[in-house]
């Protein structure tokens, strides 16, 4: 059994109400519950954290070596395009991670076209709405089954 950590960045607490034409109507607690259920069915544990504060996400990443986290799934939200600190934290703990986005940043404003995480991620899943999370989790489960 592996422990998986799911991190959500700024404004994702507003899912279901914020720009539903882009992000959909499903709420973050609904996403977390569905992913935790799927991880459990695959024999793994999953915990999640959402924060609008960069330092909270970084501190949680820093705690992963001591808590047995095997894999990180992260939707960094707007921190994707701005946070060298988040990138450095992920590199410091040296755990595999997948970057997730509900929308496809490359079809949006030009400032969203750059990710500070993508070149270090095992993979990036974007543009499939809520299914982006499910696809990412299935990829992680498959990797864990093959002894990353």
Curated annotation (Swiss-Prot):
InterPro entries linked to this entry: DHquinase_II, DHquinase_II_CS, DHquinase_II_sf
Sites marked Transition state stabilizer: 18
Catalytic activity: 3-dehydroquinate = 3-dehydroshikimate + H2O
Amino-acid biosynthesis recorded as keyword: yes
PROSITE patterns to which the protein is assigned, alphabetical: DEHYDROQUINASE_II
Keyword Amino-acid biosynthesis: yes
UniProt pathway: Metabolic intermediate biosynthesis; chorismate biosynthesis; chorismate from D-erythrose 4-phosphate and phosphoenolpyruvate: step 3/7
Keywords for the protein's UniProt record, in alphabetical order: Amino-acid biosynthesis, Aromatic amino acid biosynthesis, Lyase
A biological process from GO: amino acid biosynthetic process
Active site residues per record: 23, 101
EC number(s) recorded for this UniProt protein: 4.2.1.10
UniProt-recorded Gene Ontology molecular function terms: 3-dehydroquinate dehydratase activity
Domain of life: Bacteria
Binding site for substrate: 75, 81, 88, 102-103, 112
CDD domains noted in UniProt: DHQase_II
Job description of the protein: Catalyzes a trans-dehydration via an enolate intermediate.
Subunit structure: Homododecamer.
Family: Belongs to the type-II 3-dehydroquinase family.
Protein name per Swiss-Prot or TrEMBL: 3-dehydroquinate dehydratase
Organism of this sequence: Xylella fastidiosa (strain 9a5c)
Recorded name of the encoding gene: aroQ
